[in-house]
Every structure is written in C-alpha cells, then in structure tokens.
C-alpha cells in the first residue's frame, strides 16, 4: 500500500520481532520476522540487532519503539500494514464429549464427563460452550457417545431456545452412530476418529465457508477468548496451532508435552512422557516471557488439548494422510509436525485439566479461596448454564466459612467450612461439613415426605442430623442418614465399596449417585 505512518521513537522502549507468542490480554510479546510485515518493516528501518518487548493490536502499533542504545530521539517512516482480522462466522468449534470418563469414575457411572457438575451449579460442558459464546463463535458441534442422556438434556435446556443468541449459528449434537453391517465395530476409537466420523458435516452448504476448526475438550476449567487463539493461528499461517501452558515437573507427565523453537513452531510433541523421555522434553520457558523463578518452577510446555486446524489441513490429515490414526495427541499431532506447520500459542491464564477425581476435587475447592485463581464471576464473560428457577437458599442459624452455597438449599443449624454445596441440597441439624463437595439433587422431597420416610426408618435425600463429613465428594441425590461419620481416618488411598455406596480415590471418599448411607455408618 502507498500509505505510510510516521512514529516518534523515544529513548527507552523497543521492539521484539522474534516470537509469535501472545497472552490473554490480546497483546503481542513479539512476532516472527517472516510472517508479520509490520515487524519486518520496523526491524529493517531501525537496523537494530537486539530488541525488547513491544505491544501490538489489530491494524496499528500503539507502543513506541527505539533501538537498545539510542543516542537521540528519531522519527521512522514505515508503510502501512493491515492485519487480516478473522471473522468468527468462518470458524467452527467441535467439543469432544464422548469419552468413557474412566478417570472420573464413579462420577461418570451414569453421566458423560462433560455432564458432571462443577462449581455448584454448572456442568463441565458449560466451560467450552460459554467460551465459544463469549468469543462470538456460534457454529458448535458436540460429539457424544457414552452415558449421553443427561448431557443431551442439559444442552437442550440450556442452549436451545433459552435466550442465548446464536445469530446464524447453531449447537448441534452429533451422537456416535452405526450403520448396518458395522455393529460393534464403529464406535469412536479416539478423539481423531470421533472427528473423522463427522467430517461430512463440513460438506453441507451452510458450513462450506468454515476456514478454521477448533477442537475443544469437555473436561477443562479455564476462561479463554478463542478468537485471540484463532487470530494467532491465521497470523502465523499455520496448518495447526496448539494452545499450550507452562507446567511444573510434578504435573508434566499427565499431559502431552511440546518443544517450541524461538519462531513459535512446534518441533517435538510427546504424549504423557515419563522417565528419560520426560526429562528430554524440559525446556527454557523464559523464552515464553516467564521470569527466571517461574521458568524454574514450570520447565515444561503442556498441550492444553485445544487445537485450531485449517479446515483443509484437518480434512487432509484425517482422510488421506493418516486415515487409521485414532487420537490427536498420541498419533495425529506428532506425525503432522514432520510435514506441516504446527505452531504453539502460549496461554498464561488459569487452566486446569480436571479429568481425574483428585484434580476435579482440588479445582472445585480452589474456588472457595479468598483470592481464587479462577472464578465464575465475570460480567463481561459470564458462564452460562441451565435456568432452573430455584428460590434463594435458606440457612437457619448456620456457620459458614469460605464456602459456596448454590440456589434452593435448606440448611438448619449446621457448620459448613471450605465446601461447595450444590443445588437443592438439604443439611439437617448438627451437620458438620469440611473440605467437601456436594453436587446437590435433581428434585425436592417435601417436609411431609421427609417426615414419612424418617418415620419408616428410611433415609431421605440430603444429610441427616449430627453427621460429620470431611474430604468427600457427594454425588447427586445421595441419601446420608443421621450420626454418620465420613472422614477416612485410616487415610485409605484407593478402595471400591459399591455395595456400600462409596469409593475412595486418591484419599477422597466419593459417595455415588443415589447411594444410601444408613444411620450410624462410619467410613
């Protein structure tokens, strides 16, 4: 273009045209020379060999830049560079909700992982769904397979006709299917196989304008503007972009790990490595903008399981290059690195994979901290869930410390410390809850029904008188009698007691859905 800008360059700021990493506040830590014309022109005009940080937004530079060792102020004239802004209408999201949820068992005994409650009143599926809505992405596919009834019901109640505006978009549930002759052979075999089975949807006329496809997980807790992610993907002209986060050595083997060069390109991917393989994935994360101490604490880069593909690249990978590969993390991505441009996008905000009982429990209880790293309260980017039209919680002479109490609960002269109480929960006189996650109930029992059950020696939904519970997850519609003690005093780490209505995972007692714990039971 013929137009140009003039910039007054002071004596204390500078520019870094080396990296393509961006943070969540929509500003660049830097940009690659070979992909960003604005940085190329600045670098050429300044003639400097070493640069520091510079901020950019769409279309124009709003920070001031100088060389490292300026002798005087100067003016630089550079030609205008316009950055192509991605249209959300050309982006589709695929949310993976079909896993068997083995690591979250027994919470997934009757429900798909994305349908598991979180934060008192939400479901895990609400996280990627809300992030899509807040990012103006309104073409959303949800892939389901195991125990999908409650997930389908929640999606229908929450996102179909309940006031959430999708414009020309949609939310479409794609359930695992079989055709005659395929019985027992064609269930989803992995994340990539699940997407492959439904690539035909992008042949529909309404989806032919889709240029980029997001692949999202249904068991993570985070707040993310996906359009920042997609914009970075388009800016770098990558075939695939992986959203990544720095992690500590103690957590590293739980994730797919990547190595990224200084141009932002992923040069190595290893799925959940251990031992020597884990050590080989260690990297200097100061290049991501971490301080020396932060880099020491988090010397690995984990893939978040959030991917952005060029539509053409995704179709080619799954149907032509790797038609028998079933999983993105362990098969497709590592293979694609060899002959495709795979870029890394560094996400520096809170992110937690809550696909195990331990991480699920810890991530939930972290919400009650005085200054939590993540919270659902944000008027600009709210999290949506099903409208249940419940009355406010009623608490009679209760003591509550660092806790979250959902709508529609009845609490009578009880103590609740560092716990989350789900919707429609009932806590009777003398109950003591500590470090406990209670998922609530799907329906109420009236006072007369409760009285009748107690008179018959039965246990109503909720927690009975003088019961004491610590370090526990109580699934929906559980019935816990009076004078019960659930504390795992023996510090048992793993146990299966389905006939008694509970399991123990990582030292956390899990009372299963609809279980009945009789009066006086000690666990």
From Swiss-Prot:
E.C. number(s) listed in UniProt: 2.7.7.27
Record bears the keyword Thylakoid: no
Keywords, comma-separated and alphabetical: Allosteric enzyme, ATP-binding, Chloroplast, Nucleotide-binding, Nucleotidyltransferase, Plastid, Starch biosynthesis, Transferase, Transit peptide
A single Gene Ontology CC term: glucose-1-phosphate adenylyltransferase complex
Subcellular location: Plastid, Chloroplast
Pathway terms, separated by semicolons: Glycan biosynthesis; starch biosynthesis
Activity-regulation annotation: Activated by 3'phosphoglycerate, inhibited by orthophosphate. Allosteric regulation.
Transmembrane segments: none
A Gene Ontology biological process term: starch biosynthetic process
GO-annotated molecular function: ATP binding; glucose-1-phosphate adenylyltransferase activity
Function: This protein plays a role in synthesis of starch. It catalyzes the synthesis of the activated glycosyl donor, ADP-glucose from Glc-1-P and ATP.
Family indicated by similarity: Belongs to the bacterial/plant glucose-1-phosphate adenylyltransferase family.
NCBIfam families tied to this protein: glgC, PRK02862.1
PANTHER family, per the entry: GLUCOSE-1-PHOSPHATE ADENYLYLTRANSFERASE LARGE SUBUNIT, CHLOROPLASTIC-RELATED, GLUCOSE-1-PHOSPHATE ADENYLYLTRANSFERASE-RELATED
Name of the protein: Probable glucose-1-phosphate adenylyltransferase large subunit, chloroplastic
């Amino acid at each position: 273009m013929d137009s140009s800008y003039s910039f007054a360059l002071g004596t204390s700021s500078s520019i870094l045209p080396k990296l393509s990493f961006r943070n969540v506040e929509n500003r660049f830590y830097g940009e690659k020379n070979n992909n960003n014309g604005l940085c190329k022109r600045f670098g050429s005009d300044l003639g400097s060999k070493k640069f520091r940080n510079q901020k950019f937004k769409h279309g124009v530079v709003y920070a001031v830049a100088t060389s490292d060792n300026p002798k005087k102020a100067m003016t630089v004239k550079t030609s205008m560079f316009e950055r192509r802004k991605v249209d959300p209408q050309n982006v589709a999201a695929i949310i993976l909700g079909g896993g068997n949820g083995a690591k979250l068992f027994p919470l997934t005994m009757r429900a798909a992982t994305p349908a598991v409650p979180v934060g008192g009143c939400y479901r895990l599926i609400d996280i990627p769904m809300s992030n899509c809505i807040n990012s103006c992405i309104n073409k959303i596919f949800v892939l389901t397979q195991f125990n999908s009834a409650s997930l389908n019901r929640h999606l229908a109640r929450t996102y179909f006709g309940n006031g959430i505006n999708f414009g020309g978009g949609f939310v479409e549930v794609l359930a695992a299917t079989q055709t005659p002759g395929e019985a027992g052979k064609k269930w989803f075999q992995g994340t990539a196989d699940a997407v492959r089975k439904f690539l035909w949807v992008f042949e529909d006329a309404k989806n032919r304008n889709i240029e980029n496809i997001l692949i999202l997980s249904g068991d993570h807790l985070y707040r993310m503007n996906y359009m920042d992610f997609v914009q970075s993907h388009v800016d770098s002209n990558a075939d695939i972009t992986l959203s990544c986060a720095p992690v500590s050595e103690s957590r590293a083997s739980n994730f797919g790990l990547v190595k990224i060069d200084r141009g932002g390109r992923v040069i190595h991917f290893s799925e959940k490595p251990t031992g020597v393989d884990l050590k080989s994935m260690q990297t200097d994360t100061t290049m991501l903008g971490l301080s020396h101490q932060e880099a020491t604490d988090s010397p690995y880069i984990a893939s978040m399981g959030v991917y952005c593909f060029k539509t053409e690249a995704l179709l080619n990978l799954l149907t032509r290059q790797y038609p028998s590969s079933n999983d993105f993390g362990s098969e497709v991505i590592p293979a694609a690195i060899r002959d495709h441009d795979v870029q890394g996008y560094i996400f520096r905000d809170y992110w937690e994979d809550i696909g195990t009982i331990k991480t699920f429990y810890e991530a939930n209880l972290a919400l009650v901290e005085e200054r939590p790293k993540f919270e659902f309260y944000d008027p600009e980017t709210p999290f949506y869930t099903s409208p249940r039209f419940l009355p406010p919680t009623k608490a009679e002479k209760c003591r509550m410390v660092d806790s979250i109490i959902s709508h529609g609960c009845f609490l009578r002269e009880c103590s609740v410390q560092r716990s989350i109480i789900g919707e429609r929960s009932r806590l009777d006189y003398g109950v003591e809850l500590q470090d406990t996650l209670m998922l609530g109930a799907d329906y109420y029992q009236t006072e007369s029904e409760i009285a009748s059950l107690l008179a018959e020696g039965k246990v109503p939904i909720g927690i009975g008188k003088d019961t004491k519970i610590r370090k526990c997850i109580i699934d929906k519609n559980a019935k816990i009698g009076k004078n019960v003690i659930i504390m795992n005093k023996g510090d048992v780490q793993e146990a299966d007691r389905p006939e008694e209505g509970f399991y123990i995972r990582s030292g956390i007692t899990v009372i299963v859905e609809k279980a009945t714990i009789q009066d006086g039971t000690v666990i």
